[in-house]
């Protein structure tokens, strides 16, 4: 039973950590959609290795 509580506790802690941590700058957005995606965040669009990167203006 204590293993079940440990698993539930780990899942809850992981969920809280993922909620608190801000999203990483590299998003799963294609380079074609990058300018529109970054414009919604009021940031500058840049493509790195075919991945969209939003940078502060």
Swiss-Prot record:
- Tissue expression per record: Expressed by the venom gland.
Per the record, its GO cellular-component terms are: extracellular region
Q: Which Pfam families match?
A: Toxin_6
Propeptide residue range(s): 20-28
The residues forming a coiled coil are none
Q: List the disulfide bonds.
A: 31-47, 34-52, 38-54
GO MF: ion channel inhibitor activity; potassium channel regulator activity; toxin activity
The signal sequence is 1-19
**What does the UniProt keyword field contain?**
Disulfide bond, Ion channel impairing toxin, Neurotoxin, Potassium channel impairing toxin, Secreted, Signal, Toxin, Voltage-gated potassium channel impairing toxin
InterPro entries listed in its UniProt record: Scorpion_toxin-like_sf, Toxin_alpha-KTx_8/9
Question: What more is known?
Answer: Negative results: does not inhibit rKv1.1/KCNA1, rKv1.2/KCNA2, rKv1.4/KCNA4, rKv1.5/KCNA5, rKv1.6/KCNA6, hKv11.1/KCNH2 (when tested at 3 uM).
Summarizing the function annotation, the protein's role is:
Voltage-gated potassium channel antagonist. Has a high potency on Kv1.3/KCNA3, and is moderately active on Kv1.1/KCNA1 (35% peak current inhibition at 3 uM of toxin) and on Shaker IR potassium channels (70% peak current inhibition at 3 uM of toxin).
**Domain comment, in the record's words?**
Has the structural arrangement of an alpha-helix connected to a beta-sheet by disulfide bonds (CSalpha/beta).
What is the protein name for this chain? Potassium channel toxin alpha-KTx 8.6
Higher taxonomy:
Eukaryota, Metazoa, Ecdysozoa, Arthropoda, Chelicerata
């Amino acid at each position: 039973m204590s293993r079940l509580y440990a698993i539930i506790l780990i899942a809850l802690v992981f969920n809280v950590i993922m909620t608190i941590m801000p999203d990483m700058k590299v998003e799963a957005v294609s380079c074609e959609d990058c300018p529109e995606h970054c414009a919604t965040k009021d940031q500058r669009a840049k493509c790195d290795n075919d991945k969209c990167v939003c940078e502060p203006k």
